[in-house]
Amino acid sequence: MSLSRSEEMHRLTENVYKTIMEQFNPSLRNFIAMGKNYEKALAGVTFAAKGYFDALVKMGELASESQGSKELGDVLFQMAEVHRQIQNQLEETLKSFHNELLTQLEQKVELDSRYLSAALKKYQTEQRSKGDALDKCQAELKKLRKKSQGSKNPQKYSDKELQYIDAISNKQGELENYVSDGYKTALTEERRRFCFLVEKQCAVAKNSAAYHSKGKELLAQKLPLWQQACADPNKIPDRAVQLMQQMANSNGSILPSALSASKSNLVISDPIPGAKPLPVPPELAPFVGRMSAQENVPVMNGVAGPDSEDYNPWADRKAAQPKSLSPPQSQSKLSDSYSNTLPVRKSVTPKNSYATTENKTLPRSSSMAAGLERNGRMRVKAIFSHAAGDNSTLLSFKEGDLITLLVPEARDGWHYGESEKTKMRGWFPFSYTRVLDSDGSDRLHMSLQQGKSSSTGNLLDKDDLALPPPDYGTSSRAFPTQTAGTFKQRPYSVAVPAFSQGLDDYGARSVSRNPFANVHLKPTVTNDRSAPLLS
C-alpha cells in the first residue's frame, strides 16, 4: 500500500468516528426524545382506557339489573374484561418500550460520546507516532545517502543504508496495518451501534406482536357470541316471560329479586327490607281486594302500555310482537305488584278511563301540588296509626299526627319525613296520610304509586279534588258503601273546570252509585284537556 493510500484510509477512519459523534449520537438523542413523547402518549391512552372501561362496567351493571337485558349486562362485563386483558398487554408493551429501548439507548448514548472521543484520540495518537517514526527513518536514510555520495569510499555506507531501507519498509507496513485496522475498528463501532438500535427495536416489535396476537385471539373467540347476543333487540328473554306468567298466575305477587332494580340508588336507608308488603288497614281491605282483582291493563308512571312509543330512539327496527309480551307491558305488570301500599290505583283501558288519558298527557307526578308550607316542605296528616316495630328505618305515628316530608317524592309507596310531635325521622306508608293544604285543612290523598308516586286526581294541579272512584265503567254494587268521612266519591269529572259546579252538591249524592257509568270519553290527540262527552 502506497503512502497516499494509507493517508486516504486514515481520513476515512477519522470521518467514520466523526460521523458517529456528530451525526449518529445527536440523531439517537432526538430518537430518544421522540420515544419519550410516544411513551407519554401511550400512558395517556392507558389512563383514558381505564376510565372508558370503568364506564363500560357501569353500563353492564345497569343492564344486569334489568329483567329484559341481564344477558347483555354479562356481555358488557365480558367486553370490559377482554379489553382489560388487552390493555394489560399494552401496558406490558409500554414497559418493554421504556425499559428495553429508551432507558438502554439513553445510557448508551451518554457513555458513547466519551468512549468515541477517547477511541478517536487514541487512534490519532498511535497513527501519528507510527508516522513520525517512519518519517524519521526516511530522513536518516536521506542523510546517509548524501554522505555516501560525497565520500571517497561509498561502499562503507551501503550496509547501513540497507538497514535503514529495511527499517523504513517495516515501519511503513506497521503504519499501513494500523490504519487499516483502525478503519475496520471504526466501521465495526458504527455497525455495533446500529445493530444495538435494531436489536432493541426488535424486542419492542416482538412485544407489540404479542399484544396484537393476544388481542386478536381474545376478540376472535368472544366477538361472535357478543354479536349473537344483540342480534335480536326485540326478543324478550325466557326469564322475563316466565316472570310475567308467574305474576299473572299469582295476581301480581312477584319475587323479591325482581324488585331490586330501583333500590340501588337510594340515598336514605331502604324502607322495605325484604320487599315485605305494607299492612292493610281494616277500613280499606275490601276496597283494595276488589281493585287488585280487577287490574288488567296497568299504567306505569302515567304512561300507557303497549301503545306508548313516543320515546324510543334506540329502536332501529321494530318486529311484530304479541302485545302481551311487549316490554312496556311487562314493566307495567312488574310495577303493578311493585308496592302493596294502600290504597292501590285502579288502572283501566283508555276506552273507559279518562284518568288514563290524563296520565298520557301529564305523566309527571303532581302529588306535590298541594300541602306546601312557606319553607317549601309538604306536610301530611296521619289518617291511620303506624308502628315501626324493630325496624329503625321506619317512622311510628298515631292517627292525627302531623308529618313534614323531607324528600320530594315517594318511593315504592313509602315517603320519608319527620314527625312534628316526636321529632323522629323515618320511612312511612304514604297511603296512611292525608296531604294538608296551605291553609292547614286536610284532604284525602291517594298515592297512586307504580315505581314512583303519581296522583291521577292531582294531575291538573287542582287543590280541591277528592279521591276518584275505583272504576269508571264497572257497576257500583261491587263497590263497598263508605261513609262521607271515611271515603268520598269524586263527583263528576275533576279534569274539566266546566263540571266544577258538581262539587257543591256532591255531598247530597248517594255514594253507592257510580255517576260515571254513562260517561264516554271524547278521543283527542291534543293537550287541551277537552271535556268528556256525556250521553
From Swiss-Prot:
Signal peptide positions (record): none
Residues modified to Phosphothreonine: T341, T361
Ranges for region Disordered: 299-370, 445-477
Highest taxon of source: Eukaryota
Tissues expressing the protein: Detected in liver, brain, olfactory bulb, brain cortex, caudate putamen, hypothalamus and cerebellum.
Subunit structure, as described in the record: Homodimer. Interacts with CDC42 and RAC1 that have been activated by GTP binding. Binds DIAPH1. Interacts with ATN1, ADGRB1, SHANK1, SHANK2, SHANK3, TIAM1, WASF1 and WASF2. Interacts with ENAH after recruitment of CDC42. Interacts with EPS8.
Coiled coil: 88-153
Function, in words: Adapter protein that links membrane-bound small G-proteins to cytoplasmic effector proteins. Necessary for CDC42-mediated reorganization of the actin cytoskeleton and for RAC1-mediated membrane ruffling. Involved in the regulation of the actin cytoskeleton by WASF family members and the Arp2/3 complex. Plays a role in neurite growth. Acts syngeristically with ENAH to promote filipodia formation. Plays a role in the reorganization of the actin cytoskeleton in response to bacterial infection. Participates in actin bundling when associated with EPS8, promoting filopodial protrusions.
Recorded topology in the membrane: Peripheral membrane protein
Localization (cell): Cytoplasm; Membrane; Cell projection, Filopodium; Cell projection, Ruffle
Biased composition (Polar residues): 349-368, 447-458
PTM annotation, UniProt: Phosphorylated on tyrosine residues by INSR in response to insulin treatment.
Composition bias type Low complexity, residue spans: 321-335
SMART domains: SH3
Residues recorded with modification Phosphoserine: S262, S324, S326, S337, S347, S367, S385, S396, S455
Domain SH3: 375-438
SUPFAM superfamilies from the UniProt entry: BAR/IMD domain-like, SH3-domain
Domain notes: The IMD domain forms a coiled coil. The isolated domain can induce actin bundling and filopodia formation. In the absence of G-proteins intramolecular interaction between the IMD and the SH3 domain gives rise to an auto-inhibited state of the protein. Interaction of the IMD with RAC1 or CDC42 leads to activation. The SH3 domain interacts with ATN1, ADGRB1, WASF1, WASF2, SHANK1, DIAPH1 and ENAH.
GO molecular function, one term: transcription coregulator binding
Name used for this protein in its record: BAR/IMD domain-containing adapter protein 2
PANTHER family: BRAIN-SPECIFIC ANGIOGENESIS INHIBITOR 1-ASSOCIATED PROTEIN 2
InterPro entries given in the database record: AH/BAR_dom_sf, BAIP2_I-BAR_dom, BAIP2_SH3, I-BAR_dom, IRSp53/IRTKS/Pinkbar, SH3-like_dom_sf, SH3_domain
Protein's organism: Mus musculus (Mouse)
Gene3D superfamilies: Arfaptin homology (AH) domain/BAR domain, SH3 Domains
Pfam families given in the database record: IMD, SH3_2
Domain IMD positions: 1-250
One cellular component term from this protein's GO annotations in UniProt: synaptic membrane
